[in-house]
UniProtKB/Swiss-Prot annotation:
This is Probable 1,4-beta-D-glucan cellobiohydrolase A. It comes from Aspergillus terreus (strain NIH 2624 / FGSC A1156). It is found in: Secreted. The biological conversion of cellulose to glucose generally requires three types of hydrolytic enzymes: (1) Endoglucanases which cut internal beta-1,4-glucosidic bonds; (2) Exocellobiohydrolases that cut the disaccharide cellobiose from the non-reducing end of the cellulose polymer chain; (3) Beta-1,4-glucosidases which hydrolyze the cellobiose and other short cello-oligosaccharides to glucose. Pfam families: Glyco_hydro_7. The gene is cbhA. The keyword Manganese does not apply. Its main location: secreted. InterPro entries: ConA-like_dom_sf, Glyco_hydro_7, Glyco_hydro_7_sf. One of its GO terms (cellular component) is extracellular region. The keyword Hydrolase applies.
């Protein structure tokens, strides 16, 4: 009787699970990267990338009927979260023709618009091709080349880490049968509520279709975790930003208690949605980054980020660039009361004061809390536009109605309106970002140069 009960329980669990489809074979585009040692020798690693489950075709398990079309759910297949998870399956992806994602050796190119698809988000897979590659960052550095020359105002070619589960949530949430192979388990410091599935269950209950994004909406739950933005950038502006959370791993939140971009009360949640950012333009150094500037976005650049600390305790995040064989130190702050060119606890406190921003960063653990979360982080690469604020927080003046002469308001040279999603999707569908030559290792091991600028 006990064995029969266990069997029945297992069958019920499978029926209610988030399913993986079989109509399209899932083949991850290969992407190599390098792991380096203290002496500067680097070994090639055979990885691949997988697209996030939110972009995938979601259809009935017993056929090919869409469970989700545009930004609405099929009510018969998805009357509630549990039934939807049982009735619907994520399927394999055609990376190039559907999503504009291509790889070649160590290079990954993401195209902004391909057919009806807008933007993409991919994760680096481990060599087993079943789990995400993870990185222990404190005491190490992470380096990559990037070409942002074809990323205009309003777009963001991002490279960042979050504390996603390496298996996509399969072991924590048995209802998730798709796992990392199908790009499940996303979370970040905005506690995003636009995810179709969280913790193996659908997010249909309370779903409200977006009024300005034909492909998205907001559900009743969000998925939270610490986020380390190494690179949020286009050809005009760039920023790197740590975002700590109260919990070190992925957690689910409900409604506006999630906070972040998707909720009425931005600071209601357990994560810091603002972070402590370093944007050279915002820090008053307006001639540093951009076309024909010190870091020239007309050309490929090498981006080096160092995580200073030991024993898991993070004390500083440093940035430098290599371009045309020369190492370029990060821009110095030109803001009164804020000194330095790296992210430290003192820098963050001084910056919040100078800009008149709420110090939500310290409330959720600050730099120390960020360091606590920086083991086994998952690498994410994406291209996207911003239906909330048109990327003005990155490359324009923000808030939109603020005086651009006030400290911290000007973040770049883009005019208001040019980054509107409708504008960039119609005028710049062929925009691209290319990431290549990813390297990871002890500090000083991943880059070299002929001279220092």
């Amino acid at each position: 009787m006990h064995q029969r009960a266990l069997l029945f329980s297992a069958l019920v669990g499978a029926v209610r699970a988030q399913q993986a489809g079989t109509l399209t074979e899932e083949v991850h585009p290969p992407l190599t990267w390098q792991k380096c040692t203290a002496d500067g020798s680097c070994t090639e690693q055979s990885g691949s990338v997988v697209i996030d489950s939110n972009w995938r075709w979601l259809h009935s398990t017993n056929g090919s009927t869409n469970c989700y079309t545009g930004n609405t759910w099929d009510e018969s297949l998805c009357p509630d979260n549990e039934a939807c998870a049982a009735n619907c399956a994520l399927d394999g992806a055609d990376y190039e023709s559907t999503y504009g994602i291509t790889t070649s050796g160590d290079a990954l190119t993401l195209t902004f618009v391909t057919g009806e698809n807008v933007g993409s988000r991919v994760y680096l897979m481990a060599e087993d091709d079943e789990s995400y590659q993870t990185f222990d960052l404190v005491g190490n550095e992470f380096t990559f080349d990037v070409d942002v020359s074809n990323l205009p105002c309003g777009l963001n070619g991002a490279l960042y880490f979050t504390s996603m589960d390496a298996d996509g949530g399969v072991s924590k949430y048995p209802a998730n049968k798709a796992g990392a192979k199908y790009g499940t388990g996303y979370c970040d410091s905005q506690c995003p509520r636009d995810l179709k599935f969280i913790n193996g269950m659908a997010n249909v209950e309370g779903w409200t279709p977006s009024d300005n994004d034909k492909n998205a909406g907001v559900g009743g739950h969000g998925s939270c975790c610490p986020e380390l933005d190494i690179w949020e950038a286009n050809s005009i502006s760039s920023a790197f930003t740590p975002h700590p959370c109260d919990d070190l791993g992925q957690t689910m939140c409900s409604g506006d208690d999630c906070g972040g971009t998707y909720s009425e009360t931005r600071y209601a949640g357990t994560c810091d949605p603002d972070g402590c950012d370093f944007n050279a333009y915002r820090m008053g150094n307006t001639s540093y980054y951009g076309p024909d500037k010190i870091v020239d976005t007309n050309s490929v650049m090498t981006v080096v980020t160092q995580f200073i600390g030991d024993g898991g305790s993070l004390s500083e995040i440093k940035r430098l660039y290599v371009q045309n064989g020369k190492v370029i130190a990060n821009a110095q702050s030109n803001v009164d009361g804020v000194t330095g060119n790296s992210i430290t606890s003192d820098f963050c406190t001084a910056q919040k004061t100078a800009f008149g921003d709420q110090d939500i960063f310290s409330k959720h653990g600050g730099l120390s809390g960020m360091g606590d979360a920086m083991s086994a982080m998952v690498l994410i690469l994406s291209i996207w536009d911003d239906h909330n604020s048109s990327m003005m927080w990155l490359d324009s003046t923000y808030p939109e109605d603020a005086d651009a002469s006030e400290p911290g308001v000007a973040r770049g040279t883009c005019e208001h309106g040019v980054g509107d999603p409708e504008t960039v999707e119609s005028q710049h569908p062929g925009a691209t970002v290319t990431f290549s030559k990813i390297k990871f290792g002890p500090i000083g091991s991943t880059y070299s140069s002929n001279s220092t600028a």
